[in-house]
Amino acid sequence: MAATGGGADDESRSGRSSSDGECAVAPEPLAEAGGLVSFADFGVSLGSGAGLPGRSVGRAQSSLRYLQVLWQQDVEPRDELRCKIPAGRLRRAARPHRRLGPTGKEVHALKRLRDSANANDVETVQQLLEDGADPCAADDKGRTALHFASCNGNDQIVQLLLDHGADPNQQDGLGNTPLHLAACTNHVPVITTLLRGGARVDALDRAGRTPLHLAKSKLNILQEGHSQCLEAVRLEVKQIIHMLREYLERLGRHEQRERLDDLCTRLQMTSTKEQVDEVTDLLASFTSLSLQMQSMEKR
């Protein structure tokens, strides 16, 4: 019995097993660095195939190579990840989300701006523009505050809107610009203001009418009318001259513009109805001649 017990002790000391006849290899303790297990060292030991019975070193390195690569990564992968994210993307992520459209309060202010322009409410239009309302904001039919003001002939509101950045060439749902609407409603001062504000000088509407056509129509009405007072006729002729001056200046016709300057000076010196009618006739002749020249240029 003693011999048997001694044999067992010898087997345990030598590390041999009585069951399989092979050597039992004790696993190596994992190295520790600062209280943390170094998986990189463990991966290296596995990759080398040390301590694995019945497996060659080359075969072990081939089969466990992917584990070694994984375990040899940095201890703090979050820092590496953070470095790969572009700085601009981090700033955008930290920035609060921008609103995709106007708020309900802003929508109400924009509608109020268009309604006020349509109602000729100059004070409200001015206040809303000073508060930051967008003068180019349109309704569901594409109409802006400038469209309404131009159609109504309110030159003061038109000038306010232009001063705050309104687009004189913005089209509504039907393709009409503010200049189209001012021409259709025969508002000569508004046409002059829009031309000064950058409105295009090509055809006013789809019929191809220009300020020259409008001026001729207005002058024909003045020549046929006999009931208007002197000051009313003089004011209307003056407005037509200013419109044509601005229009011809935009076209680069400086000689014709000088002719209009002479007519304007002559109009200011009139004191009787006959003198005003004479200037009106001269202006009508000038307009007809300009229309003929314009027609010949298009051919």
From Swiss-Prot:
UniProt-reported outcome of changing R99A: Increases the cytoplasmic protein content
Key word Transmembrane helix present: no
GO cellular component terms, A-Z: cytoplasm; midbody; nucleus
GO molecular function, one term: protein kinase regulator activity
Record flagged with keyword Ribosomal protein: no
Keyword terms of this UniProt record: Acetylation, ANK repeat, Cytoplasm, Nucleus, Phosphoprotein, Repeat
Protein name, entry field: Ankyrin repeat domain-containing protein 54
Native organism: Mus musculus (Mouse)
